[in-house]
A protein has these predicted regions:
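Membrane-anchoring hydrophobic helices of lipid-metabolizing enzymes
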Residues: 2-105, 109-134, 203
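A cross-family acyltransferase "interaction/gating" segment
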Residues: 28, 162-240
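Hydrophobic/aromatic ligand-binding patch that stacks against planar heteroaromatic rings
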Residues: 122, 138, 176-180
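Active-site-proximal segments of catalytic enzyme domains
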Residues: 113, 143, 147, 152-159
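Short acidic, glycine/proline-rich loop/turn micro-motifs
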Residues: 120, 158-162
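Short beta-strand segments
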Residues: 77, 149-150, 189
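Positions that flank functional sites
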Residues: 138, 154-155, 192-194
Length: 240
């Protein structure tokens, strides 16, 4: 192709970039913000397995990106579904990879997310923080794009028979945060996530015993054990 780098040159460049990245990690020459967000690690490593899911497995079609400002604080409010909160991760990839300004979505998560080993650290590294008004206001005042899924565990814990029916929102602290910071509220609709883990039942007794919000039973979870966590392919639309 005209203008394309020769394969050996492109490979050498990638190797050099990787070695430079590893050198920065070893020497500590990288930045982490006050919330624990590590931009370089997120973009180069943590988002890498999500991109094939976005483009190939879910074939995400993103609409309405022109409604997202290039700069300044704004609050994205989306529906929540899919048993496992992959919808939030796909929304983040949509904004980072496909918005002209490559905007990073700073997601607000429940307490349980940050209390869970590995998951909590991953969430912090990718820019998420606790779903509370003070943190939301601090991010909005800094000009960040903040994402919230106000249905919370009720959204991801509903049976397949209630797919695409909005559940009761939380207390609405995110609205007051947007009002106090004079930030626009941008609705986001996600279609396709309901089909990736069709829920048959929610074993609430087991959930209480294990100290979690939901113990989901789907056509593959827990029957196939770790393999059951592989989401079913579906066509997604994310519209702002």
């Amino acid at each position: 192709l005209p203008g394309a780098e020769p394969a050996p040159v492109a490979w050498d460049r990638k190797v050099a970039e990787f070695l430079a990245f590893m050198r920065r990690r070893v020497t500590g020459d990288y930045e982490v913000d006050e919330f624990g967000y590590d931009r370089e690690l997120t973009d180069r490593v943590l988002n890498a397995p999500l991109r094939p899911l976005y483009s190939k497995w879910f074939r995400v079609e993103t609409r309405g990106l022109e409604n997202i400002p290039d700069t300044g604080g704004a609050l994205i409010v989306a529906n929540h579904s899919g048993t496992v909160a992959i919808d939030s991760l796909m929304t983040s990839i949509a904004l980072l990879d496909h918005h002209p300004a490559r905007r990073q979505l700073r997601m607000l998560g429940a307490n349980l997310v940050f209390q869970t080993p590995v998951v909590g650290e991953y969430a912090r590294k990718t820019g998420s923080t606790l779903a509370c008004a003070p943190d939301a206001e601090r991010l909005l005042n800094k000009g960040e794009l903040v994402g919230v899924w106000p249905e919370g565990f009720k959204g991801v814990g509903k049976p397949f028979s209630e797919r695409y029916k909005l559940q009761r929102f939380g207390r609405g602290g995110f609205v007051s945060a947007a009002l106090r910071t004079k930030s626009p509220i941008i609705p986001c609709a996600i279609v396709g996530a309901e089909e990736i883990y069709p829920m048959i039942s929610n074993a609430k007794t087991l959930a209480r015993i294990m100290g979690v919000q939901n113990f989901t039973i789907t056509s593959t979870i827990p029957w196939l054990r770790p393999l059951g966590l592989e989401p079913l392919p579906s066509k997604w639309i994310i519209e702002f």
